[in-house]
Amino acid sequence: MDRISSLPDEILEHILSFLSTKEAALTSSLSTRWKNVFVFVPSLHLDYARQHENPREFIDFVDFVNTLFNRKGNSPIKKLALKIHLKDNQSLQNQTHVQSWIHRVLSRGGVTDLDLFITFKGKFQLVPLLIFKSNTLVKLRLGRGFTIKLCHENVYLPMLKTLCLDTVDFDGDHNVFETLLPRCPLLEELVLEDQRWKQWCGSVSSPSLKRLRIRFFHIPIISLDVPGLVYLELSCIFGSKYANVNLDSLVEARLNHWVEEQELRKLRDGSSHLVPADMMDLITGIRKVKVLHLTSDALELFYFSGQELPMFDNLVYLSIASDKKQGWQILPLLIKNSPNLETLVFKGLEHYTTKQCGDACVCSGILGKSSSCLSSSRVKVLEIWSYQGTSKELKQMGHFLMKLQFLELVKIRAVSNLQVPIDIQYLLKLPRASSNCKIQAIF
């Protein structure tokens, strides 16, 4: 007997848990010793996500899963990961199988991780009522492209800590979180990806939530009453109104807003019907963060909010994505209002040229005549991503080095597809206001 086969069942089951259930089942042909080991692996990874054309293949898959459940008997299942693609002409029958498998896993108890990824050929499909009652479930992921019927009495997840909803809808509930969140009292992480809740009012309220990630195309009104939240990632198109923003414990925020080019032009010439000031409640709500990441659109939306920025007294790390179509107008005030900023990251240096950049950049040609945001900043670390070594970028780097008096380290990350190597010597020879400043180039 080989050494692996002599290992205890518990260890063999743990090894097989890293394989898909289909792959683990293949080990049953190795010897009598291996015949039933895979059956008792506490995690199931069932994958039928490919768009098979042969109906017989799905029948074989269903038979395999049903046989597996029968052979497992009452042995515990800690995790179920199910990826499956359903065709329109067989969807109702196939949904019944899926619903049965989920019920069998939840009803036996002990499951801590449930990951369902169901896709359909064609339009959104209605999945029959799913009963989510479990005293042990810790992680639940649902996706993508289907509608769930959800009733108040069919949801009770007292141990759930992570909930991920990826492109799913809920039938007949204008505010699904009034049903879900109160029945998940320990929930710490909520992920909402590309939701299609046409009737959702955009409200999230939870005293236990620590991490929240939302990615929607558009939500008219967003309410965030999550006083214990420490991480927020928000991605949506400009136009949402923010109300009741309670983020007193927030440590890190990623604002990935985007603005259509035509709408951005209207904002600049004052003809937009949208109200940029509606973002001010969000900006004020995140004022206590230590780490802030902004897309180029989000940075410009800060400027068009039309009101004085709050003080970001706790901010130590600021990351800004730059694009030639978006400006740095708000950057001088943002840096000025961040007195404890230590690390400043630019994901690219190219940006839309305006006269409002102050001495943050060299593009306007009015250096020294506007706010001295860089000269008064105590930034110690400056990072530049996607550096191409152009003459304009080199000039901008020289400006940073001469204005930031407390710099200790400059990290330069070159763009990956450079055709001509960057001569680092030009950077190293630039004069610096700080005698302790070192330059580190990563190519």
Curated annotation (Swiss-Prot):
InterPro entries: F-box-like_dom_sf (IPR036047), F-box_AtFBL13-like (IPR053781), F-box_dom (IPR001810), FBD (IPR006566), FBL60-like (IPR055294), LRR_dom_sf (IPR032675), LRR_FXL15/At3g58940/PEG3-like (IPR055411). Signal peptide: none annotated. LRR repeats lie at residues 139-167, 169-194, 201-236, 271-296, 323-348, 363-389. It comes from the Eukaryota. SMART domains: FBD (SM00579), FBOX (SM00256). It holds the Pfam family F-box. Keywords: Leucine-rich repeat, Repeat. Residues 1-47 form the F-box domain. This is F-box/LRR-repeat protein At2g42720.
